[in-house]
Amino acid sequence: MKPGEIIAAEGTIELNAGQPTVTIEVANSGDRPVQVGSHYHFFETNAGLLFDRDKARGMRLDIPAGTAVRFEPGQKREVTLVPLSGKREVYGFRQQIMGRL
């Protein structure tokens, strides 16, 4: 092994294996694109995104870490969400929770 070398496991790595998922339809009602990162509390996204926020409470996008989904103006698309894990406490973002979920 060389310093800094990464040796990946063989086969396919399944993200969020065994986690419950929710699929919702999201529409961007605004006139500007909205981009949402992988670990953003989806419930607290831009108010111009129209979707069932109750289903998104405590959830984040089911995409690889460090990536994002972009919603163009007028665009509708389905996204899959997974629960935030860890302590399940949310602080910051749009300050709509500021505590335990």
Swiss-Prot record:
Q: Which GO terms describe its biological process?
A: urea catabolic process
- GO CC: one term? urease complex
Q: What class of enzyme is it?
A: hydrolase
Q: Where in the cell is it found?
A: Cytoplasm
GO MF assignments: urease activity
Cite the EC number: 3.5.1.5
| Record flagged with keyword Transcription regulation | no
* Alphabetic keyword roster: Cytoplasm, Hydrolase
User: Which pathway is recorded for this entry?
Assistant: Nitrogen metabolism; urea degradation; CO(2) and NH(3) from urea (urease route): step 1/1
| Superkingdom of the organism of origin | Bacteria
Q: What is catalyzed by this enzyme? A: urea + 2 H2O + H(+) = hydrogencarbonate + 2 NH4(+)
- Quaternary arrangement and interactors, per the entry? Heterotrimer of UreA (gamma), UreB (beta) and UreC (alpha) subunits. Three heterotrimers associate to form the active enzyme.
Stated family: Belongs to the urease beta subunit family.
- Name used for this protein in its record: Urease subunit beta
Task: Please name the source species.
Answer: Agrobacterium fabrum (strain C58 / ATCC 33970) (Agrobacterium tumefaciens (strain C58))
* Lineage summary: Bacteria, Pseudomonadati, Pseudomonadota, Alphaproteobacteria, Hyphomicrobiales
